[in-house]
């Protein structure tokens, strides 16, 4: 068996090797569960522990990614082969949900959370980083690579990809568009490994487009982690190292700059960002 085959067999998708390999009943049940959960959550407005106001001041439910989690749980209950791969993603879900429930915007970015720690305060954002780091280590270890550099580059890809999607989740559909686009940049085989989330996010997306729910840290970190796991299974070693370096650069840049402002100054990116939801509201470009 070649190295590529061994890696592929070890990582085997977070969700399945090919979309067509997922039993149709499992796929339908998972998508239905995601859509139903999103529909129920969308009726809550700003009520409950996950109630918030969005960037336009409208009532909204955060942690909409729980709808995707619900779909994964249903799929795992119906197909035992999916459970180990789904389990790898749950540290990211737990860390994100913790921040969605009790986190505050007082501290932002790595600098903000580390600065709070130096003052003796442990923020939920710092706990989220801890859960994400643990999840990334677990995901990288599942590949069984004996090479230390490759192990740490894989860990960085998964952890930083999860956090990057967290940074993107500031406008409706932005993180979902980035996820769909990035998934299709990978090989067709790798797109298949993301099939459950690719399809499961479709019914959810309608509610996010109407500003009833947002992914929150729960959903953004889930999508980013799933994409990161897929990337370290699909890309060669050099590609993974380059991706890790690119993610580091993006995070350093994002510590000092606004992603939303960057998009707003570029007409093409602004149009892509507004597509799918701007017809429902007047988009605002400031954070």
Per-region residue spans from a language model:
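Acidic, Ala/Val/Gly-enriched low-complexity intrinsically disordered segments
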Residues: 4-8, 16-17
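Membrane-proximal soluble regions of multi-pass membrane proteins
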Residues: 65, 247-287
């Amino acid at each position: 068996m070649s190295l590529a085959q061994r890696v592929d067999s070890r990582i085997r998708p977070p969700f399945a090797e090919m979309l067509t390999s997922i039993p149709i009943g499992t796929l339908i049940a998972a998508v239905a569960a995601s859509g139903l959960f999103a529909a129920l959550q969308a009726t809550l407005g700003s009520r409950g522990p996950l109630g918030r106001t969005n960037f336009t001041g409208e009532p909204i439910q955060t942690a909409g990614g729980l709808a995707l989690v619900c779909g994964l749980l249903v799929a795992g209950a119906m197909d035992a082969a999916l459970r180990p791969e789904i389990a790898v993603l749950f540290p990211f879900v737990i860390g994100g949900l913790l921040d969605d429930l009790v986190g505050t915007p007082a501290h932002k970015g790595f600098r903000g959370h580390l600065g709070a720690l130096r003052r003796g305060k442990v923020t939920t954002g710092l706990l989220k980083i801890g859960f994400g780091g643990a999840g990334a280590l677990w995901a990288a270890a599942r590949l069984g690579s004996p090479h230390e550099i490759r192990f740490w580059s894989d860990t960085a890809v998964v952890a930083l990809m999860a956090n990057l999607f967290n940074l993107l989740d500031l406008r409706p559909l932005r993180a979902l568009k980035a996820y769909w686009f990035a998934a299709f940049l990978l090989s067709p085989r790798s797109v298949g490994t993301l099939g459950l989330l690719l399809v499961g996010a479709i019914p959810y997306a309608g509610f996010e487009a109407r500003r009833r729910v947002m992914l929150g840290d729960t959903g953004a970190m889930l999508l980013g982690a799933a994409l990161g796991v897929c990337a370290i299974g699909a890309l060669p070693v050099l590609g993974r190292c380059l991706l890790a370096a690119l993610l580091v650069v993006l995070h350093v840049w994002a510590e000092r700059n606004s992603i939303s402002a960057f998009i707003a100054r570029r007409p093409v990116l602004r149009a892509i960002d507004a597509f799918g939801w701007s017809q429902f509201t007047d988009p605002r470009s400031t954070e």
